């Protein structure tokens, strides 16, 4: 991921689907790929195997896949950050509580970590894309909460 992105940046290539400004900064695709890879590697499994081993990794990744486009579209269509946050929270809770029901994600973790996915959408910085912060914020949260789960 890092090598390919480095080559792309060095050559100033903009891949189909990327924004023009990504020709000289790390792309959202690279940030998302890197953060999801890290989440898959270090998300606690709580001793589970198979699909149930994704009790934290799945909602973190689904959160990125669902909440990011929901909030992005709401912001684009309504230009209302408050509405985007409220609908993002709703979508995030649907994801996290769905994983509580289907995968056994601890309810306490679902309630606490769902807002962190939404908070990850809010920072506007050129240093790191929201595709990464939407994964890293709940991932850091689950790592810090793990002793109490």
Where are these regions (language model features)?
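Interhelical loop and helix-boundary elements at the membrane-water interface
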Residues: 1-149
């Amino acid at each position: 991921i890092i090598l390919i992105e480095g080559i792309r940046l060095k050559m100033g290539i903009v891949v189909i689907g990327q924004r023009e400004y990504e020709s000289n900064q790390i792309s959202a695709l690279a940030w998302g790929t890197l953060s999801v890879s890290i989440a898959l590697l270090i998300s606690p499994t709580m001793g589970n195997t198979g699909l149930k081993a994704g009790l934290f990794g799945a909602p973190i990744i689904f959160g990125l896949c669902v909440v990011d486009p929901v909030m992005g579209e709401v912001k684009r269509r309504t230009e209302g950050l408050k509405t985007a946050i409220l609908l993002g929270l709703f979508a995030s809770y649907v994801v996290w509580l769905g994983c509580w029901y289907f995968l056994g994600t601890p309810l306490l973790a679902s309630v606490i970590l769902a807002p962190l996915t939404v908070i990850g959408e809010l920072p506007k910085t050129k240093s790191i894309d929201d595709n990464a912060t939407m994964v890293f914020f709940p991932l850091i949260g689950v790592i810090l909460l793990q002793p109490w789960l």
